[in-house]
Structures are given as structure tokens and as C-alpha cells.
Amino acid sequence: MEKITIFDKTFKTYIPYDEFIGDIDRVAEELNRDYSGGDDIPIILCTLNGAVMFCAELMKRITFKCEFATIKVSSYSGTQTTGVVQVKQPMLCDVTGRRVIIVEDIVDTGYTMKLMKSYLSEKGAVDSRICTLFYKPESYRFKDVINVDYIAREIQNQFIVGFGLDYNEIGRNLKDIYILDE
């Protein structure tokens, strides 16, 4: 088991790339099934910076026509979610009357997704769905209110880095997923 150090924290391998890439294949198949054949062109909205690697892998597998856009939101400080969500870089496309697929690296408490769904509704989107690489069901606070539509993999309520996820902006480039080694 490989161990790495980022600043003051040591991490160990949690999920190797080869184990979760099949989860991305499955989610892409679900999206292709649900969005192929429609007259409209949905928007794939990648949340920066964490979802970039997941979104890139997903986009390679999507077979329906789609538009690509980005948005930057943040709710983390170090290893903890702050509970305060901020839009740091708004999307540059018009979502009025459009369907939007929010691509997220990890859904934890759900506060970011609650803000995103509300934000997209205010901007005129007719539908928004959540597609996440990782989902922490133990910490999710909006189970009866906001559905997480496409989940690549459920994980335990532990802090992870790699494949886009970071610890103070470091570790996004790691191919595998690492967990705190405590």
C-alpha cells in the first residue's frame, strides 16, 4: 500500500484508478441512456477544480450531443467542509430553458449541490441533475429534498485526495484515490 505525504498529512492508497474507472464507464452508460435521442442539447456543467479529471473521463464516454461549461464553487477549508458555499467563478453560458448535468467530484454534506440546484433554477434551467464520482451517504443532509441522480461510487465519510480531489490545492494530479492514514 503506497503512502504519500501532503504538507502535514500522510495518506495511503484507498481506491486504485483501475478499480473506479469502471464506475465512470457505468455512469456514462446511464447518462447516454437518459440523454440520447432528445431534441435539446444538455449542458455538462463541470465544477472546478475538483471535478475536472472525472469530467474529462466522463466526456470521452458520452455519445449524445452536449455543451460543456464550468463553474467554480467552494465549501472546503483544509480537510473540513465549512458549510458556507460560495460561487467563486460563475458559469459563462445561458442555461435558460436548458437541461443541466452538474458534474461533481464528491457529494459530501450536500450544501454545494443545494446551492447549485437553486442557482441553476434562478438562472432558468428547466432541469438539473447531479452526477458525482464519489458520494458520502452518511454525511449527506438532503436525502429527502435533493436527489443525487448519478453516483459512480459510494464511500465512507472520510477525507480523500487524488483524481481531482485535493488537500489545500495539492494532490489533484494523483491517479489513485488516497485516504488519511491515521
Residue ranges and their predicted role:
Residues 1-182:
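PRPP-associated nucleotide enzymes
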